[in-house]
Amino acid sequence: MNQLSLLAEFGEPITRVENALAALREGRGVLLLDDEDRENEGDIIYSVEHLTTAQMALMIRECSGIVCLCLTDEHANKLQLPPMVINNNSANQTAFTISIEAKHGVTTGVSAQDRVTTIKTAANRDAKASDLAHPGHVFPLRARAGGVMSRRGHTEGTVDLMQMAGLMPAGVLCELANEDGSMAKTPEIIAFGLKHNMPVLTIEDMVMYRNQYDLKLA
């Protein structure tokens, strides 16, 4: 079965987006799938605004362990976060910056609580570059201007979802993994969503939603 038929129990594309936005406003997580011919993987996504230590612990336990903070290009510039590498030749051009740690309020930086502290410090509207140390255990990602309409990636999807939900334009993501360490695909992602009461949606759903409502996002 393909991605679309497996997702049918979560409703039609527009409904899937609306359910995801409602969940984010309520402080719950969502699962975002990219295109089948791209990574074909699903990321757990939480808003920074409502992020809890328990949610971070679940991400660390159930996912790849590489917890990323998705930021607008403007906010990443404000924090003076240069690219992780000068020549980004990765397949999907994921815009990693140098890693970060909060300068205050953390110990080793690797615990769930410490990562939440770092994330909330960095995403704060009044945050300054001097609030952060490098390297660290949180990996910021720059979302491309135009969101999923310009790049069909989880980074852009995350920031778009936060803006569409009326939340701070910053979110965290991590790729869902199976118990054996392999990456979860659509059937496992759907099962996880049902178990943990997380709506599942796709990048394509978001593109359709933005086109239908002619949404112009930063």
Swiss-Prot record:
This is 3,4-dihydroxy-2-butanone 4-phosphate synthase. D-ribulose 5-phosphate binds at residues 38-39, 43, 151-155, 175. PANTHER family: 3,4-DIHYDROXY-2-BUTANONE 4-PHOSPHATE SYNTHASE, GTP CYCLOHYDROLASE II-RELATED. Homodimer. Binds 2 divalent metal cations per subunit. Magnesium or manganese. The record marks 137, 175 as: Essential for catalytic activity. GO terms for cellular component: cytosol. InterPro entries: DHBP_synth_RibB-like_a/b_dom, DHBP_synthase_RibB. It comes from the Bacteria. GO terms for molecular function: 3,4-dihydroxy-2-butanone-4-phosphate synthase activity; magnesium ion binding; manganese ion binding. SUPFAM superfamilies: YrdC/RibB. Catalyzes the conversion of D-ribulose 5-phosphate to formate and 3,4-dihydroxy-2-butanone 4-phosphate. Mg(2+) 1 binds at residue 39. Keywords: Lyase, Magnesium, Manganese, Metal-binding, Riboflavin biosynthesis. Pathway: Cofactor biosynthesis; riboflavin biosynthesis; 2-hydroxy-3-oxobutyl phosphate from D-ribulose 5-phosphate: step 1/1. Its EC number is 4.1.99.12. It holds the Pfam family DHBP_synthase. Mg(2+) 2 binds at residues 39, 154. The gene is ribB. GO terms for biological process: riboflavin biosynthetic process. It catalyses: D-ribulose 5-phosphate = (2S)-2-hydroxy-3-oxobutyl phosphate + formate + H(+). Belongs to the DHBP synthase family.
